[in-house]
């Protein structure tokens, strides 16, 4: 668990759902500084690389942007190899003194694979095609898992999971951004 520092910008919820030939990453737009909402429409889910990878990040905002930039550099080194780029980033994350102190996590996906890159330098694949991170991640994960076996689409599941998380988590709002890709 990340220790809360009231002078650090925290909070968000990111969820990913892979179902029926689609992969979706959704995130909210709230940025909090301590117990104050600083911004309600931040964009924490975006396309990276050549537009064939989607990423969502949670944690300390500056740290998350640093990791996002590092992942983009790895994707330039290893184009169309998200798994390899992520593993190489994780190696750097574990060995670089500066990167080891970063307090952020990312969910990334391309047409083939969905991964979580954790603050400890781990690269994890989701079970059941669903994964969530951030302050409301457990709520979004539970909601998405409950809905994955229904006839709802990946995007519908992600949006519903995000709305449930936003109803419960004070660091998550209802300004939801969704990015999707066709999946194999």
Swiss-Prot record:
Keywords: Allosteric enzyme, Cytoplasm, Hydrolase, Metal-binding, Protease, Sodium, Threonine protease. The keyword Hydrolase applies. The keyword Transport does not apply. Signal peptide: none annotated. It is an enzyme of class 3 (hydrolase). Its main location: cytoplasm. GO terms for molecular function: metal ion binding; threonine-type endopeptidase activity. Pfam families: Proteasome. GO terms for biological process: proteolysis involved in protein catabolic process. Belongs to the peptidase T1B family. HslV subfamily. This is ATP-dependent protease subunit HslV. The lineage of its organism: Bacteria, Pseudomonadati, Pseudomonadota, Alphaproteobacteria, Hyphomicrobiales.
